[in-house]
Amino acid sequence: MKKQNDIPQPIRGDKGATVKIPRNIERDRQNPDMLVPPETDHGTVSNMKFSFSDTHNRLEKGGYAREVTVRELPISENLASVNMRLKPGAIRELHWHKEAEWAYMIYGSARVTIVDEKGRSFIDDVGEGDLWYFPSGLPHSIQALEEGAEFLLVFDDGSFSENSTFQLTDWLAHTPKEVIAANFGVTKEEISNLPGKEKYIFENQLPGSLKDDIVEGPNGEVPYPFTYRLLEQEPIESEGGKVYIADSTNFKVSKTIASALVTVEPGAMRELHWHPNTHEWQYYISGKARMTVFASDGHARTFNYQAGDVGYVPFAMGHYVENIGDEPLVFLEIFKDDHYADVSLNQWLAMLPETFVQAHLDLGKDFTDVLSKEKHPVVKKKCSK
């Protein structure tokens, strides 16, 4: 990519030309490999990127919520997401929805509640790096603690909308008062102050201690916690970074969503691989990345990502994620499945006869000798001589 007066231009060697019309130069700077794609890109490949910065933001007195769904990123038919921020003490009101909800706490801390169909209550505090999972149809809430909270929500249906959930206050606002009174065994006068519309996100005082909020019931405790301390587990570490994996094998309740938190150091990359079970949905937390997706039949397309971007890789398509910045790249891989699975290109070739691989790639023993039978999700790039 050539630059004129620090302005990027779509020129590679003797191909391309300078841009003469008005344009968004900052967007071009953020997407160098889209402005000037690698020579290896070819054919028509669907868009696999959308930024939360380009979404509508729902502002409330206690915080905000914005979403990336199939409406914003059409290829993402199986997963949708919400970025939510709550001020200290603010509450995402009691509600439920048809879709299961998976969450990663990015900033601050919050208290979550959920009650299952047997009337068993679960209440816990979650902090940065923690997860929660609420099965479809079960009522729950989120309240920010002292520092406030910001988190990513992922739902197992791409057409989910944060504006179409079942709210406690919305339901009661659209139910006759005499019915509500009869249901709870009170008079209409005793419920005269019920809100006339949904609260959704609203300000409130900070809660007391977690111990004081625990509610014991006659039906005992839930069999498995609905929260998970992801960063307390041992990651898969390599020279180039580390990976934390959470799925139904270690986070028992997470039956429809599996995940990986990936850190890629500068000069390293998430290795060439693919996923044999489902599509991959991504959220970029920090750093700068590029990813090329191989769609078969000679088709491939490269994308750039940074904090706040959503990425996507369709089922079984080969790809890598490279750190192109000077700080650690941190991102989430999310899958609509009960378990995490990937196939490493390096390991695949290492587990085949050497001469068989050499015949395919027209490479010699020097190449096959360095193949690894062990999987290394993140690899450090070797400098060329």
UniProtKB/Swiss-Prot annotation:
Question: Which consequence is recorded for altering Y340F?
Answer: Leads to a 13-fold reduction of CO(2) production
Q: Which GO terms describe its molecular function?
A: metal ion binding; oxalate decarboxylase activity
EC annotation? Answer: 4.1.1.2
Active site per database record: E333 (proton donor)
Q: Which Pfam families does its entry note? A: Cupin_1 (PF00190)
Q: Does the keyword Protein transport apply?
A: no
The pH response of activity is noted as:
Optimum pH is 5.0.
What results from changing R270E? Leads to a 20-fold reduction of CO(2) production
Q: Which reaction does it catalyse?
A: oxalate + H(+) = formate + CO2
Instruction: Relate the protein's function as given in its record.
Output: Converts oxalate to formate and CO(2) in an O(2)-dependent reaction. Can also catalyze minor side reactions: oxalate oxidation to produce H(2)O(2), and oxalate-dependent, H(2)O(2)-independent dye oxidations.
Provide the protein name: Oxalate decarboxylase OxdC
